Amino acid sequence: MTKQEAMAFAISVGKPIRHNSFSKGEFVRDEGKELVDEEGTILPQQEFWAIRSGGSWENGWEEYNDN
């Protein structure tokens, strides 16, 4: 899915998302105004998405599946 779709999915569905460039087991999930990664680290949403903009970051997002 696109970056915009991933952002909307994370907020509306509440399930973790990942980018195809993330390592196995890496994901973020929406927690209100912040994102939380797989280790519980709080990531400010605005900063997270600003860093991951343009180029390959605009596509390649998916729902995280730990299988």
Predicted regions and their residues:
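Structural boundary micro-motifs
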Residues: 1-67
